[in-house]
């Protein structure tokens, strides 16, 4: 029989329900988590045995949103969900990052977490719900996992921190921060902010971590009631004798290799040392496991780098702990792009471009939480050549999507409002070289490229990656980390912002025991680094260019009476289509009567504005217009005036004499002066050529063509 076990608790302004034992009973563990009608079903399956020769931990996290959760049918051709969207990929990463460090070292059994959104309240984002669900399911499963974790979203409204703000509240918030951690320590932070101070950001992290303890307590209570027995897993016993033998052969040589400052040269030397050491040991005993030897060598390598940093010795590339690598900053490097920059920091380099488009270039995102339009796009590409490798080139991978999102967050706070700068902006960062923190190089490059494109950003922004090496109470915070320092260190801490404050903060911590004080030191050290980089960037370009590129569309905005929108659009869009073809511009009309005309040529834009003004102008009774004959009928002629509006010139109003035949006086396409006699209630216009010519005397009334008179 189905025997659901349920726990309910209050979490900020929301009620959270954890339920297990009802569904997916063949999975290792399954939990349905709901928070005020947003429900996510999370399952965990772990393999009891590791695959032979497995040398890494194969953890997979899948997050999938079902449109039925919002009471909708997918809009795709096949009417079913397809591959993960960018948003789903980002949330999968958000779940993965805090749980991955909590599996014990040496655990290489396959584990898969699947989170499925099955119901959604548009005010409650499913990401926090999914993170709580993954934590609960892993804790219930019996798989070796040093959790549970809690997760919280923190907003900052009216100088107050807000726990798990609703979507409406987030629109008013200066901060959107997600923090996850265990009972004792923060493990992950992901945030964007409107240039808040270091203290405000740190306060938000501490607030979120304190508030999420209620989640951890309730998951622990659920585990007591419904948890499965802990797996009897033990790490492989350490072969002390083999470790000592490998260290004797390789430690001193690896220590020397890590004094080589050039990355490629260092990697080549390390590879030689490893292969020679393994060859020597296999020659002594062919029964040794090559994978095990590789792991021992990696541990020695890690220890060499860490111990040198903790001893206060220079880093791998010879720098002190708070030194930034050499910077090279150039703008306007590509002639035909709207804005471009090449930003180089040591062996990390980004070629960044900015492209301006119109509102119709904006991306319409049909998300579970509702449809929204994104007018600022940021794409990050990491080709294999950037690290001197060959590999697949194609659609962006999870890492590229995640890094692009982080870089976008770094720049978003300084982007101008649409009413001040009505362009869709796309930034693309091509990583051409990489050795540490290419996402932060993308932030710096984006700031430069946007200024080069003439985008009036509120301030220049720069980003920096910090690292940490900690043993016991001894720790060192490193500025501008290399790839190796990221890989071998205990924390990856990325901060982007302007001179005035932080726009984005991302933190991934691999160990417990990172205190508030350590985070404070890292944030303050990052501020110094950020200000140094901004100083160098300002030497290349210190303000947005006064004008946009000659190759970018210029958007001119005019306002018309909303009642006249139908006249500009025309039947089935005929008028606006003809206008865009005639003027060579792009025209967009909003419901409030705002008309945006985009053109690369100023004269074309002026022509389009003039034509729209003609179409929307009120026809004045008694005024004389120049019109064009569009139709000739027995009882008169129709003449187009004022932007395509047609009026009738009755046969009696063509000349001051009796007209027997209209074609004796008028031809199709002929331009004639006409006076407006009347506009009736239905908008029909009566015109007169006779009165217009009388008014403009000494000009005579139109004469019949000479040939016809002579007949």
From Swiss-Prot:
Lineage, highest ranks first: Bacteria, Pseudomonadati, Pseudomonadota, Gammaproteobacteria, Enterobacterales
Protein role: Involved in mRNA degradation. Catalyzes the phosphorolysis of single-stranded polyribonucleotides processively in the 3'- to 5'-direction.
GO biological process, one term: mRNA catabolic process
Binding site for Mg(2+): 486, 492
Known catalytic reactions: RNA(n+1) + phosphate = RNA(n) + a ribonucleoside 5'-diphosphate
Family: Belongs to the polyribonucleotide nucleotidyltransferase family.
EC number annotated for this UniProt entry: 2.7.7.8
The name this protein goes by in its record: Polyribonucleotide nucleotidyltransferase
Subcellular location, record wording: Cytoplasm
KH domain span: 553-612
GO molecular function: 3'-5'-RNA exonuclease activity; magnesium ion binding; polyribonucleotide nucleotidyltransferase activity; RNA binding
Organism of provenance: Escherichia coli O8 (strain IAI1)
Keyword check for Metal-binding: yes
PROSITE patterns the record matches: KH_TYPE_1, S1
Residue ranges of the region described as Disordered: 689-711
Bilayer-crossing regions: none
Cofactor entry: Mg(2+)
Catalytic EC class: transferase
Alphabetized UniProt keyword annotations: Cytoplasm, Magnesium, Metal-binding, Nucleotidyltransferase, RNA-binding, Transferase
Keyword Transcription: no
Amino acid composition bias (Low complexity), ranges on this chain: 694-711
Primary site of residence: cytoplasm
GO cellular component terms, semicolon-separated: cytosol
